[in-house]
């Protein structure tokens, strides 16, 4: 088999772009908590000493946006100008308008209801925009996620944990990780390189303090966790690069401006799957950029969990104002155990991919989104992440899902 290297990256919650994502989703949650029917599209720009929040919102709720912004920044850990930002004293500018009535009419009264006279309640809500969304799953990890992004997220999360719990007290909130894994064909076989870049206090020696601490308290525990999870990966002799530029004292918004929606590959599958281009954070679930991407993860994960393929990528496409998708495509990269046409047929029978049905089946009108905004939207076993359930493998609550005549090889 041919050997190749594949790389994915992650960032900590203190990365400027991730601060912006978390602020946008915190505002979204506050509005959904009071009014689950809120229509929200909130973007955040953060730079030295200033946060600017803009977008379109139609809601009956009230959210103290400036207060929410400051609380989130302080929670992340930016509480001093020495760290590059202070949530207590930063400026907050808000420019929020209402959702365009031209968009609202297509969402509130879908083409099927408005033009075709369809009375099905689920046909009343149209897609909030045109677009294409992808979902992906594979059997490389128990979470059915690609191993490179899985490990990169775990390293980023631990980097934040050892900062917050005082294990490495001189770390600051901004940080990045990157993982390069060698594949033999489609099988992950060896860890090649780990890159960890972390903002730190001044006067910290890289070689004698930071690098050994990162290896001992961040990287090695996560490699041990892989073994405990039953993931077989050769890790002897991997290369560890810690802050390869040298000093990393200036970080956060002082080092780089942050924007909502600039980490869409980190948010999804680390580049292992295609991406439709739409970001997630700050968008309520009437926006199919978000809800349909979650649904596609749900679909792909159930396909792999059912044993129909070891790798599955699913694409769905919508027209603005229409409820029914205009396209569905399944790719299994040659790993399918039955014909992909039958998998696609089963998906169409098992999953209702109209926006209102996705929102209903995944219970997406809850204030659950701020916790999605760092360390990945997929592959996390949290009860709020309903799109991670494999509840359609055996047809729970519905007629037999993976029907014997459609899927003869399923266990």
UniProtKB/Swiss-Prot annotation:
Name the InterPro entries on file.
ADOMET_SYNTHASE_CS (IPR022631), S-AdoMet_synt_C (IPR022630), S-AdoMet_synt_central (IPR022629), S-AdoMet_synt_N (IPR022628), S-AdoMet_synthetase (IPR002133), S-AdoMet_synthetase_sfam (IPR022636)
Q: What is its main location?
A: cytoplasm
As cofactor, the record names: Mg(2+); K(+)
Record text on cofactor binding: Binds 2 divalent ions per subunit. Binds 1 potassium ion per subunit.
PROSITE patterns associated with the record: ADOMET_SYNTHASE_1, ADOMET_SYNTHASE_2
Q: Which residues bind ATP?
A: 15, 174-176, 247-248, 256, 262-263, 279, 283
Provide the alphabetized UniProt keywords.
ATP-binding, Cytoplasm, Magnesium, Metal-binding, Nucleotide-binding, One-carbon metabolism, Potassium, Transferase
What is the E.C. number?
2.5.1.6
- Gene Ontology cellular component list: cytoplasm
Q: In which pathway does it act?
A: Amino-acid biosynthesis; S-adenosyl-L-methionine biosynthesis; S-adenosyl-L-methionine from L-methionine: step 1/1
Q: Name one GO biological process term.
A: S-adenosylmethionine biosynthetic process
Q: Where in the cell is it found?
A: Cytoplasm
Q: Residues that bind Mg(2+), according to the entry?
A: 17
Residues that, per the record, bind L-methionine: 56, 99, 256, 287
Q: Where is this region: Flexible loop?
A: 99-109
Protein task: Catalyzes the formation of S-adenosylmethionine (AdoMet) from methionine and ATP. The overall synthetic reaction is composed of two sequential steps, AdoMet formation and the subsequent tripolyphosphate hydrolysis which occurs prior to release of AdoMet from the enzyme.
What PANTHER family is this protein classified in? Answer: S-ADENOSYLMETHIONINE SYNTHETASE
This protein's assembly is summarised as: Homotetramer; dimer of dimers.
Hey, which family's this protein in?
Belongs to the AdoMet synthase family.
Q: What protein am I looking at?
A: S-adenosylmethionine synthase
Write down the species.
Streptomyces spectabilis
């Amino acid at each position: 088999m041919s050997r190749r290297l594949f790389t994915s990256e992650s960032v900590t919650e203190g990365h400027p772009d991730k601060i912006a994502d978390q602020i946008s989703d915190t505002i979204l949650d506050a509005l959904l908590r009071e009014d689950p029917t809120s229509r929200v599209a909130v973007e955040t720009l953060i730079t030295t000493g200033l946060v600017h929040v803009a977008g379109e919102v139609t809601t009956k709720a009230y959210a103290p946006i400036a207060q929410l912004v400051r609380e989130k920044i302080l929670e992340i850990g930016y509480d001093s100008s020495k760290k590059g930002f202070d949530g207590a004293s930063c400026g907050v500018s808000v420019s929020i308008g209402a959702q365009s009535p031209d968009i609202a009419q297509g969402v509130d009264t879908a083409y099927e209801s408005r033009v075709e006279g369809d009375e099905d309640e689920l046909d009343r809500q149209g897609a909030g925009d045109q677009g294409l969304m992808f979902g992906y799953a594979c059997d490389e990890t128990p979470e059915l996620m690609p191993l490179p992004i899985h490990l990169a997220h775990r390293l980023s999360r631990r980097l934040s944990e050892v900062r917050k719990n005082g294990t490495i007290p001189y770390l600051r909130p901004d940080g990045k990780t990157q993982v390069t894994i060698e594949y033999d064909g489609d099988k992950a076989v060896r860890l090649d390189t780990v890159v960890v870049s972390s903002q730190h206090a001044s006067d910290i020696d890289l070689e004698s303090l930071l690098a050994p601490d990162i290896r001992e308290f961040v990287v090695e525990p996560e490699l041990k966790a892989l073994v405990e999870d039953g993931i077989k990966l050769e890790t002897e002799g991997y290369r560890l690069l810690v802050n390869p530029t040298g000093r990393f004292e200036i970080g956060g918004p002082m080092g780089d401006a942050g924007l909502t929606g600039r980490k869409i590959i980190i948010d999804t599958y680390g580049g292992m799957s295609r991406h439709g281009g739409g970001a997630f954070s700050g968008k309520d679930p009437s926006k199919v950029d978000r809800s349909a991407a979650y649904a596609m993860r749900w679909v792909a994960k159930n396909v792999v969990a059912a044993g129909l393929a070891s790798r599955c990528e699913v694409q769905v496409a919508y027209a603005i104002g229409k409820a029914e998708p205009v396209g569905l495509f399944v790719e299994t990269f040659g790993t399918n155990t039955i014909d992909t046409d039958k998998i696609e047929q089963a998906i169409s029978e098992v999953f209702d991919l109209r926006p209102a049905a996705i929102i209903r089946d995944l219970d997406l009108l809850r204030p659950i989104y701020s916790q999605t905004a760092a360390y990945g939207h997929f592959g996390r076993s949290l009860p709020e992440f309903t799109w991670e359930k494999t509840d359609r493998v055996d047809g729970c609550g519905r007629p037999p899902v993976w029907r014997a005549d459609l899927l003869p090889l399923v266990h």
